[in-house]
Amino acid sequence: MINLKSWDWESSEKMIPFGDWQGNFEWVEEPYASPDGEKIAAIVNVAEGEFKVCVNGESWENTFDKIWYLRFAPDGRLTAIVSEMGEWTVAVDGAAWENKFGYAWNTLFSHDGRHIAVAVQQDMAYTTIARNGTGLYLAAFGFDQELRNGRQVER
């Protein structure tokens, strides 16, 4: 749900030179605007097999093998599903979660954006992982290993 209280109703026009990004990167794909219209983000290719996210002309510091599914959380943070060394996870404002999976998809948010969930697959098991603002995992079902405080623990 969009928080209309955070909108800047006074600004008449804001220009973000999105077209200029083409000259700064190999290519630009999947542009995605924030719900309040203040930010535009896109996946950018910086070199062969190296991708970043660019927000209002500023690139994330971290580089990833692949990136997709840009989404702004209700609290304004930008998330992306990212791949590092063939394993997938979620990056929030450029910082990747520690836990990696065979695949990840369908990022979802709590109403206030404090909790982020993503569907994941690991070793032919499918589940949903949810993470709160303190970094603790709230749910992890269907794996041979349990996640506690963001770390895998043998059962």
Label for each model-derived stretch:
Residues 3, 10-51, 61-71:
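Beta-strand-rich domains and repeat architectures in extracellular enzymes and scaffolds
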Residues 119-126, 135-138, 142:
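Eukaryote-skewed repeat-based solenoidal scaffolds used as protein-protein interaction platforms
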Residues 46-47, 58, 92-95, 122, ...:
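Beta-rich carbohydrate-recognition and catalytic domains
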Residues 24, 37-41, 76-78, 113, ...:
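Long, low-complexity, acidic Ser/Pro- and Gly-enriched intrinsically disordered regions
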Residues 24-32, 64-74, 101-113, 139-153:
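Repeated scaffold domains used in trafficking and secretory/extracellular systems
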Residues 16-23, 57-63, 94-100, 134-139:
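A short beta-strand motif characteristic of beta-propeller blades
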Residues 41-48, 80-86, 117-125, 155:
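Beta-strand C-termini and the immediately following turn/loop, strongest in propeller blades
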